[in-house]
UniProtKB/Swiss-Prot annotation:
InterPro entries, per database record: Heat_shock_Hsp33, Heat_shock_Hsp33_C, Heat_shock_Hsp33_N
Protein's name according to its UniProt entry: 33 kDa chaperonin
Keyword Transmembrane carried by entry: no
Organism from which the protein derives: Prochlorococcus marinus (strain NATL2A)
GN (gene name): hslO
GO molecular function list: protein folding chaperone; unfolded protein binding
Cystine pairings recorded for this chain: 247-249, 280-283
Compartment annotation: Cytoplasm
Amino acid sequence: MTDSLVRATAAKGGIRLVAVSTTESTKEAKERHSLSYLTSAIVGRAMSASLLLASSMKVNHGRVTLRISSNGPLKGLTIDAGRDGSVRGYVGDPSLELDLIKNKSNHYTFDFKKATGIGYLHVIRDDGKGEPHNSTVELINGGIGEDIASYLLHSEQTPSAVFVGEKINQDGIVCSGGLLAQILPKAERDYSLIDLLEDRCKEINSFSELLNKKGNNLISLIEEIFPDLDQSPSDIISTSQEVHFKCRCSRERSLSALKILGKDELQKMIKEDGKAELTCQFCKNVYLVKEDELISLID
């Protein structure tokens, strides 16, 4: 089944809602990077969050990059998502696995805080016009949801609730997705809406369990929290979009990257190896560049 993203509003346009499923995208990331259970969860959550943020970009070619730089054993994370529904990403240590811990509900969960450690979340928004907008906030707990909510509050001054989660068992990834609910600028001084948003979100005890219950029915997921949507289900479906793991790497980009190395470095490659092999960090595609191609880059 294809991943997707839907948008809706509630409270007469005062609250913006976006829901996304990233089950298949997370499965592909797991396969490409040989992710562990823990890193599959982290990558899935980060892909969901980045797609939720990218959904508000004004232009279809707009992109959002999430980066975690910290002292934890995860050794960093980078996710790149587009307004067009494309997403890709990787972590520093894809094989990382840690003991499960008990949460406040006495259920076992992944130890995201220990995995990420102490550090920062960087959010880069690029609409293709001028310099990208870069924001940095301290990590809250590494579970991505609260970290993104902190970014939205401190960097964009937007009261928001961000939920990301997954269901993973011994057979693999069952589901992965996220939900964003935020007060729109025109209603940000309406404190009754802020109270409404807080009250509705408090009703969510476990987003991962709710996500698993609803499967890929994103409209039902939103209605579980905001049953009084402004749009009908058919209207929401008509504006939904597909989400997919898609890398922007190509052979042409690989050749351009090699050319930047300069004549001396290319001649060294030709002399020592007679070829070059480049591996994309985001998708693990391998590009083999033969000797004659290296020579042509020098000429």
